[in-house]
């Protein structure tokens, strides 16, 4: 049987173990526009040269293994291998560096975040020669992006569906997150929506437990939405969590909610990218918005030296599909440095983002007109945080006050009213040219003079702050 010889065949097969850097470290390589580029923070074991550690990452995340193999002669490694094309020392870190690796596009299945991540991060993180490894950023080429659907609808389509413009959207996670009956759950939804919120939502771990089966919850929530819409004249919504044990069950729950224009919610990391992409395509086909919760993200992204940065997970989610995703708050109870957070918020929402190392963005990213994803600020926020949230996140965001609504001393509806009044006051002040960060306290106090609900919330939470140093910084 005849076949064409590759460059490797012309040299001949040489069995044995050789340094990775002899094959996979190519500092003279110029990345192509079609390459997927990765920036890894590498901490090698003592005694392992930087070039060898970087080349090992390139090899083990593409075509390499620990020894030469005869079947290398049956392909063209120069065409398919990953290449470490640059090593960047980190100031103040003698044992760490950034390795830049280019992957040929042919290594990846079209439209598959699952396959892309399996290759790039699936095996190499357990490599013994590395003390720690973190994927800081990816550059996804336009040629690969065009094989993905992306978000089911995107920011502008959501605005048009809801007929709400010029301000962030206001939401609330129903608490307690577990234990309520379906009927009492629906009651809380109704009270929050009637009080002035745009949305309420399921929490990440409410699926279909013995105390509240999914079908019962969906039906009581539907009644609550319809009643609140009729009374307020506004379009209302609730994020129904359809995360399930199987993809078939997940799609069945989404199909059940389709007829009353529901908003679907999904835990994209615990359920997996295959399930998320499947659900995203179903939501686009059926005209349903898709809300994404990032449950489990901190297991991967919180440690500075090991794991996957959330900006990478955010890019992957935009490709896989979701109309909004939780991003942290900067000011609330959850981890989030301001510069870093705004960096990946822009990566979610904007069409073209320039490289900006001050915000942790290692590569310029062109999204090729893929719809944007709305950022969701949620976790330990209350009315005093409203000016900062509006200033930080702008209009294309969902601000979700769970305890900051349901913890109001007068009940759920007054809690919702307090948040709506605070939001409207901040938007008016911003539009009048006032400085929300400098004058935010005065703006809230002025609004509280004519809103007893807001005044009560201000008094309750005036001492509550979450002032801890962020662990993940530039």
UniProtKB/Swiss-Prot annotation:
Substrate binds at residues 123, 173, 177, 294, 326, 378. It catalyses: 2 (2R)-3-phosphoglycerate + 2 H(+) = D-ribulose 1,5-bisphosphate + CO2 + H2O; D-ribulose 1,5-bisphosphate + O2 = 2-phosphoglycolate + (2R)-3-phosphoglycerate + 2 H(+). Pfam families: RuBisCO_large, RuBisCO_large_N. The modification N6-carboxylysine is found at residue 201. The active site is at residues 175, 293. GO terms for molecular function: magnesium ion binding; monooxygenase activity; ribulose-bisphosphate carboxylase activity. The disulfide bond which can form in the large chain dimeric partners within the hexadecamer appears to be associated with oxidative stress and protein turnover. One of its GO terms (biological process) is reductive pentose-phosphate cycle. GO terms for cellular component: carboxysome. Its EC number is 4.1.1.39. Its cofactor is Mg(2+). This is Ribulose bisphosphate carboxylase large chain. It comes from Synechococcus sp.
